[in-house]
Structure formats: structure tokens, C-alpha cells
């Protein structure tokens, strides 16, 4: 997941990643973008174009992906990345998320909710990774410290019991 600072940044990231995939012949991979409303930008030909989430998100057969279908589509093997602008930073319970690139200032509850998208367990998921281009570690740590509480265990626990639930 790439967390961007604006809808304009999201569509620009989208176009750059699409060009990269095409240039390097990653024909079996694709990306999805999530943002609300419509945004205008200048394309490579110098023309003003209006973009929407549905207009950009297409299946291999060319059909458009509606917003209501986005979460389901993300589960398909070809979608390796989701680029977001003020979407899916809260309440997006997706265990498949492993890596997050953050290019947006975060603090407080927004930082906790956004970064916590990665903390869901999934079969085969051993760790997570965050590459943050926009935030200082001490601000993120302070954001989490508000919610941090010490937990004392009365006895030894078996961490593998978590996987039995999956």
C-alpha cells in the first residue's frame, strides 16, 4: 500500500507505477488506486484529463472496477499494490497487507490507524515493513505511546495458538 498526501499525488504515483510495470514487462502485475471524487491533471500530451477511481482501475479485459468491488479485486494475484489518498487508512481490515510506503505526514490517531492496517495476521505472513518518506520516527512513536499500555502475563503463552485461529 502506498499512502499519498493527496488525490493528485495518488494519480501521479499510479501513472508512474503503470509506466514502470509496462517498461519492465511485468505483464502479470497490476495496481489499484483508491480516492474519492474526481481530480484533474495534465497528461503527458499536455491535455487536461479528469480522473476517477473507477476510470483508472481496470481489469485485464478492460472492464472498469467499481469502488464497491475494489476490496474483492485486491485479493486477486495480479494486484500487487494499492495506492490510496485519504481512503483505506482506517477500517480497512486486510490481512494480506504486508508493506506500506508512506508519503504523507501522519500523527496522533491518524498515524496509529494508518500504520495499524499492517498488523493483521495471515497464513505465511511473518513480518511487515514500513518505508516512511514523510515522518520523523519520534512523532510516530509518540503517536503510538498514547495508546501503549504494559501487559503483564501470569504465565507462558504459545504464540502459535494465533495461527490455529486462522
What are these regions (language model features)?
Residues 1-166:
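RecA-like P-loop NTPase motor core of helicase/translocase proteins
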Amino acid at each position: 500500500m502506498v499512502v499519498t498526501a493527496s488525490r493528485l499525488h495518488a494519480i501521479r504515483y499510479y501513472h508512474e507505477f503503470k509506466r514502470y510495470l509496462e517498461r519492465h514487462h511485468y505483464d502479470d502485475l497490476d495496481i489499484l488506486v483508491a480516492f474519492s471524487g474526481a481530480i484533474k491533471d495534465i497528461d503527458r500530451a499536455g491535455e487536461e484529463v479528469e480522473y476517477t477511481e473507477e476510470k483508472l482501475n481496470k481489469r485485464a479485459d478492460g472492464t472498469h472496477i467499481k469502488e464497491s468491488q475494489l476490496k474483492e479485486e485486491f485479493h486477486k494475484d495480479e494486484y500487487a499494490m494499492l495506492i490510496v489518498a485519504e481512503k483505506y487508512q482506517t477500517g480497512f481490515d486486510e490481512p494480506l497487507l504486508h508493506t506500506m510506503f508512506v508519503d504523507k505526514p501522519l500523527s496522533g490517531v491518524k498515524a496509529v490507524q494508518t500504520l495499524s492496517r499492517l498488523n493483521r495476521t495471515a497464513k505465511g505472513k511473518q513480518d511487515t515493513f514500513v518505508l516512511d518518506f514523510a515522518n520523523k520516527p519520534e512523532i510516530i512513536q509518540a503517536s503510538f505511546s498514547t495508546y501503549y499500555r504494559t501487559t503483564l502475563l501470569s504465565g507462558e503463552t504459545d504464540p502459535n495458538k494465533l495461527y490455529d485461529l486462522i
